[in-house]
Amino acid sequence: MTESNETPNTPEAGDESKHRRIKSFVMRAGRMTEGQQKGLEQGTPLFVLPLADAPVDYDQVFGRSAPRSLEIGFGMGHSLLEMAAAAPDQDFIGVEVHRPGVGALLNGVLTQGLTNLRVYDCDAIEVLNRCIADNSLDRLMLFFPDPWHKARHHKRRIVQASFAELVRSKLKVGGILHMATDWEPYAEYMLEVMNVAPGYRNLAEDGKCVPRPAERPITKFERRGERLGHGVWDLKFEKLA
């Protein structure tokens, strides 16, 4: 559900690939429904933001100053739409490269008449580095990222020490990094990374995972998993001064 991009870097790609940042995603083609195509055609000019070369003034983009959340890898956008609709006094930024997902979200924005949501359809790390000012986000959400199960692919996981450091620089003091996964080994891995990341406090009473926060909508995929006895692990970390 998190990100996507070009062909993954491999040694066979030549020497140039060795100097590229390893991506946590692979671009996959997908069929577009009529609604998704409509969303892209009508919603892109209104709600999709271009990569910038300097931090963006989102107060100007949204026409107000409000609490601001960013979700990396919103998939088909159901959760992000629900959160934005439920909190009209807050602003939301979604990042996703899967075109059908972007189209689905934009179609929902148009259908529901939402004005508090904007989208980037490119690499989330590029968005954080180039568009998001330091100390500006109230919350960053990473729900059900690709766990890259095989050990040789662990380097592709988005949650790394460098990611934790980058996110911390973008969060306000007291801002929250909220992650969720349905694969327990990945939850344990994320805890290992975050528990040694400087400048964070784990909000779980036991120092592990928090109960599912009410503000995170339950997806159809998650409900199906619950019926099958599958678990979901939520992690919340607060940025310290």
UniProtKB/Swiss-Prot annotation:
Residues reported to bind substrate: K150, D182, T219, K220, F221, E222
GO CC field: tRNA methyltransferase complex
PROSITE patterns in alphabetical order: SAM_MT_TRMB
Keyword Zinc-finger applies: no
The enzyme's E.C. designation: 2.1.1.33
The reaction(s) this protein catalyses: guanosine(46) in tRNA + S-adenosyl-L-methionine = N(7)-methylguanosine(46) in tRNA + S-adenosyl-L-homocysteine
Enzyme class per UniProt: transferase
Gene Ontology molecular-function annotations: tRNA (guanine(46)-N7)-methyltransferase activity
Alphabetical UniProt keywords: Methyltransferase, S-adenosyl-L-methionine, Transferase, tRNA processing
Pathway(s) annotated for this protein in UniProt: tRNA modification; N(7)-methylguanine-tRNA biosynthesis
The keyword S-adenosyl-L-methionine is assigned to this record: yes
Region of interest (Disordered), ranges: 1-21
Residue numbers annotated as active site: D146
Biased composition annotated in UniProt, kind: Polar residues: 1-10
Family in the record: Belongs to the class I-like SAM-binding methyltransferase superfamily. TrmB family.
Protein name (Swiss-Prot/TrEMBL): tRNA (guanine-N(7)-)-methyltransferase
Organism: Pseudomonas fluorescens (strain SBW25)
Taxonomic path: Bacteria, Pseudomonadati, Pseudomonadota, Gammaproteobacteria, Pseudomonadales
